Swiss-Prot record:
Name of encoding gene: PPM1A
Record protein name field: Protein phosphatase 1A
Record field: catalytic activity: O-phospho-L-seryl-[protein] + H2O = L-seryl-[protein] + phosphate; O-phospho-L-threonyl-[protein] + H2O = L-threonyl-[protein] + phosphate
Phylogenetic placement of the source organism: Eukaryota, Metazoa, Chordata, Craniata, Vertebrata
Family statement drawn from the similarity comment of this UniProt entry: Belongs to the PP2C family.
Binding annotation for Mn(2+) 1: 60-61
Species assigned in the record: Bos taurus (Bovine)
């Protein structure tokens, strides 16, 4: 569940890179949570003859960050170094890759269990994992838990991973077969995901294999043939993002941002901020991977964006002036704007994605405001 801070930590960790015809950016932010338990991996060019392959993943830790941190450093090695992945001589086949990914997950989970037992079970943390392994011909989506990945192809959501929730019929059946129950949509009324790495308290049912436990470390793997013409971008994100934005919303929002900037870190920062302002209370991490045919910056879109920002600035000034005596608080300004039909707001992001612009104008016009009223708080914002 996790405890919350009095105000969100909005400092971000960023990275970006390019290679193998891909560009990526990432952003992660602690937000309202007391701890930062997310982790991520981004590797372009893999060792051992896989220089044209790339790997990206987001890990959403719970009950501590140890498992997420260990996976972000070691999961890729466990996947690419097992015999199932390597197969016989030459490049691994599609089946080799899929089997190798599954084996890698089971191996790292068992390895972490042994380490945990040596420490007398001191680590009770767990982590989801969502990732993509991109070869020259295929994109392999990998999912274990309720983080999510999606592929935008030809301006639409073409594929997205399915969240592993305890209430899903197949997941529920496995949990019940292992002697557990699903209460308040949680495993034994406690854990909100039905598949994860770590969480060894839920993996000790005697007579059941590793994939038959209350919580399973088995990933779902989907291979998608790459389309140079139509593939645009991939988004990997933890549930702190998906809790407040749907697949189509996020796809539309990212596409609209790519038309106004080619800075992928900036796009990811906008996603994270927008989700905070839409009410997400969780840690947030997002990786954006762009294929060669991703949307390009359009002068028309840039002009439209500048006009929107100017319009919002003038409206904030008008709202403050209209108040007469005393300056209205930021919540009042946001609510007033939310009640209006403002043209050309970014799709998917809507007014929340312009909160930084609105706040900057508000602060400029009201430099002596009391800091207590400065709410990055999203409580009761609208």
């Amino acid at each position: 569940m996790g405890a919350f801070l009095d105000k969100p930590k909005m400092e971000k960790h960023n990275a970006q890179g390019q290679g193998n015809g891909l560009r990526y950016g990432l952003s992660s932010m602690q937000g309202w949570r007391v701890e930062m338990e997310d982790a991520h991996t981004a590797v372009i060019g893999l060792p051992s003859g896989l220089e044209t392959w790339s790997f990206f993943a987001v890990y959403d830790g719970h009950a501590g960050s140890q498992v997420a941190k260990y996976c972000c450093e070691h999961l890729l090695d466990h996947i690419t170094n097992n015999q199932d992945f390597k197969g016989s001589a030459g490049a691994p086949s599609v089946e080799n890759v899929k089997n190798g990914i599954r084996t890698g997950f089971l191996e790292i989970d068992e390895h972490m269990r042994v380490m945990s037992e040596k420490k007398h079970g001191a680590d009770r943390s767990g982590s989801t994992a969502v990732g993509v392994l991109i070869s020259p011909q295929h994109t392999y989506f990998i999912n274990c838990g309720d983080s999510r990945g999606l592929l935008c192809r030809n301006r639409k959501v073409y594929f997205f991973t399915q969240d592993h929730k305890p209430s899903n019929p197949l997941e529920k059946e496995r949990i019940q077969n292992a002697g557990g129950s699903v209460m308040i949509q949680r495993v034994n009324g406690s854990l909100a995901v039905s598949r994860a790495l770590g969480d060894f308290d839920y993996k000790c049912v005697h007579g059941k294999g590793p994939t038959e436990q209350l919580v399973s470390p088995e990933p779902e793997v989907h291979d998608i043939e790459r389309s140079e013409e139509d593939d645009q971008f991939i988004i990997l994100a933890c549930d702190g993002i998906w809790d407040v934005m749907g697949n189509e919303e996020l796809c539309d929002f990212v596409r609209s941002r790519l038309e106004v900037t080619d800075d992928l870190e900036k796009v990811c920062n906008e996603v994270v901020d927008t989700c905070l302002y839409k009410g997400s209370r969780d840690n947030m991490s997002v990786i954006l991977i762009c294929f060669p045919n991703a949307p390009k910056v359009s002068p028309e879109a840039v002009k439209k964006e500048e006009e929107l920002d100017k319009y919002l600035e003038s409206r904030v000034e008008e709202i403050i002036k209209k108040q007469g005596e005393g300056v209205p608080d930021l919540v009042h300004v946001m609510r007033t704007l939310a009640s209006e039909n403002i043209p050309s707001l970014p799709p998917g992001g809507e007014l929340a994605s312009k909160r930084n612009v609105i706040e900057a104008v508000y602060n400029r016009l009201n430099p002596y405001k009391n800091d207590d009223t400065d709410s990055t708080s999203t409580d009761d914002m609208w």
